[in-house]
Amino acid sequence: MNEPLPRPAGALWGLVSRPSWRELRLRQEGRDLEAHPIWTGTGVPPGQGRHIVLVPGFLAGARSLSMLEPWLQRCGWDTRRAPVGRNHQPGEHVVELLEEWLAETTAMEGGPVPVIGHSRGGQEARVLAVRHPDAVSLLVTLGAPHRVLYPPHLVVRAPAAALQLAAWIRRSRPDLTGHRRYEADRVGPFPSSVPFVSVYSHSDGFLDWRLSLDPAAEHVEIDCTHLGLAASVPAFEAIARALKSL
């Protein structure tokens, strides 16, 4: 947990600081996944109809869960994909939506439920678990930037800045109170009662793996792309191991 943070990124460095071409492996990762026994549920703990909340990544929306969600359903889980669209709204606004979704899901389940978040969705899911530890039975984050609000890569930082500015203009003034609250819970103490697994990859083409390190989490290193953290054999194996703890 003493790994230094990546160097601050200017525009040019932010563009080239991560080898984004690694993400070209994603298609092959998908083919490998569909040919692997885990894709049909082999070795995966059966969900037995239990509910599970899924939070998609930044700008990707449902696409980032296009393999994870049907796989969990095939394994017997009743998936509840969070209604956050492409997940481009300010973090506090997204978490407010997640809080309503979590309340509905736990009411349906009759108790706490596991939450899985990819990329920015994992960061938001951490905030959700901090605020509602009694409603979350397990938190699994996949390539989540726990140590910064947004990764320094220009592919992420540029649209994030533009969308944040647009959101502030629409609201006439920034929600600074909400932003401060979100930031405090993003990096603040995590409830010891909630199992927390942070999965990351050194081969991530967008996010420096060190940004996924959280002092409260069990860290699981795998080898895949950033998008493959929700669509690859090693990612699904890591998720299956985490679900076995329930």
Regions found by a protein language model. Name each.
Residues M1-V53, A60-W71, C75-A82, T105-M108, ...:
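Flexible, membrane-associating and regulatory peripheral segments of lipid-active enzymes
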Residues A9, R18, G43, E124, ...:
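Sparse, context-dependent recognition of short Cys/His-centered cofactor- or disulfide-binding micro-motifs
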Residues W13-P37, G117-P133, P145, F196-F206:
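Contiguous hydrophobic segments
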Residues T42-P45, G49, P56, C75-T79, ...:
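Residue-level signal for well-ordered alpha-helical segments
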Residues H51-R63, M67, Q73-N87, G91-V187, ...:
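Serine-dependent carboxylesterase/thioesterase catalytic core
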Residues L68, H132-P133, L154, S212, ...:
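Amphipathic, positively biased hydrophobic alpha-helical segments used for protein targeting
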Residues S192-L246:
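C-terminal catalytic-base region of ester-bond hydrolases, centering on the histidine
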